[in-house]
Amino acid sequence: MTDWTSGYVADIGYIFGYYLELNPQRVKLAFLNASLVAPEFGTACELGFGQGLSANLHAAASVCSWHGTDFNPSQAGFAQELATVSGANAHLYDEAFDEFAKRDLPEFDYIGLHGIWSWISDENRAVIVNFIRKKLKVGGVLYISYNTLPGWGTFAPMRHLMTKHAEVIGADGVGIVSRIDGALDFTEKLLATKPLFSRANPLINEKIKQIKDQNRHYLAHEYFNRDWHPMHFATMAQWLEPAKLTYACSAHYLDSVEAVNLTPEQQAFLKDIHDPMFKQTVRDFMVNQQFRRDYWVKGARRLTPLEQALSLREQRFMMTAHRPDVSLKVTGSLGEATLTEKVYAPVLDLMADHKTRSLEQIEQAVKDAGISFAQLIQTVLVLCGNGTLSSVQDEATISKAKKHADKLNTHLMLKARSNNDLTFLASPVTGGGVALGRFHQLFALAIQQGKKKPEDWAAFVEQILASQGQKIVKEGKPLETSEQQLAELTSQAHEFAIKQLPALQALKIV
């Protein structure tokens, strides 16, 4: 009998996650910062899309034609449901990579893989590389994220032990969640004996504690597949060489801000390394990199300084956060750093009204603050990297995408009546997903249904909870009466009206 799972965990679904780096709209800022030409994105593909939330949000929030596959039929079925509801140009399948590659597919401007590279066999990696070689256009971009060495070097033996316990000791027929719990309990008991391994690697105990608190669906796919291969950057480069790809830049904007990631001594050391690929490998040792999120390009083309500056000034942004809640702290590999208030505050104050502005308009508006263009670029990178600002699509794209985003968002908000699994909605303004918890989605649904006041939104949500016997948990205790629930929801609704609603309206979600 053929094992259609190829050693991949398939008896438990993956989490309903959204990964903003998969949004092609984010490529342009990263590429321009790296002085690279970015393509216009008309066709895109996601390989191993999981539950398909990212693929569907990106298809509904843009005019890009999306294709993708995930071999798990239950996950693909859910993804197809969302695509049907939105009516967006999304073609999602439940096929293995080699089957999918045989389809009559277009050439793609963009191909994305989030995480799966680390969890599949070398055979499947070869299939993916061949697919990229054939289907990624010249000038096209690959986004790929993967577990990285040396950061995973210490924990890899412990992961091997946990999976062996689940395989050898875990009882057949009890399911992967029980086997994971058993493996974690066993690991804790082992560490309690103070083995020399944990003395040599003192951070292992804390790592196991962190893992115990994580979603079991996530752990099943992150740690308990048959194949699990963290990889050095240089090894990844060797894999992608047959597809004619070269490294472009990190998809994680904060990686480009060296001051929060590397000491002055480390920055000076890296400057003496002239090979860009080897430089990345060395940098991974400096930051003990565990997970890379990278853009690769088929045929990199460099911009002149003038072309770079002109293109950057054309980029449009808006603030998606509530200004009083924005922190001037940022976390990099070196830990927490404080942002320079005299540089960041003028930009934040200007953008607090959630209006869309080009970088040129921002530059002109804050010119009296003495902020240089280089400082402004870094400010925007940091604020986009921490979710305070977002890139904005052109008006024609926003207009075309809105009807599909509206349909998908209504469907997701209706699902929020019964559970909190899906915590993102689509914005035609940013071309991607926006995080929004269950109650906030239900407040937005109440507004969509014509309710005007926070008190009305709260009553709407309280009725939904009461009909299902659901209670709000506050400070660890359930609220017992409907009056208590309504009071809590009313308080949350008033806060929502002040903190979230203005941004959601600017994002054209509400």
Predicted regions and their residues:
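Conserved class I S-adenosyl-L-methionine
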Residues: 146-170, 183, 189-196
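Short acidic, hydrophobic short linear motifs in intrinsically disordered regions
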Residues: 356-366
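Conserved SAM-binding loop of SAM-dependent methyltransferases across substrates and taxa
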Residues: 51-63
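Conserved alpha-helix/loop element of class I SAM-dependent methyltransferases that forms part
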Residues: 7-42
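Conserved beta-strand signature within the Rossmann-like core of class I S-adenosyl-L-methionine
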Residues: 139-147
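Short, amphipathic alpha-helical interaction segments positioned at domain boundaries
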Residues: 398-449
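A short glycine-rich, Lys/Arg-flanked "PGG" loop and its adjoining helix->strand segment in the class I
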Residues: 126-138
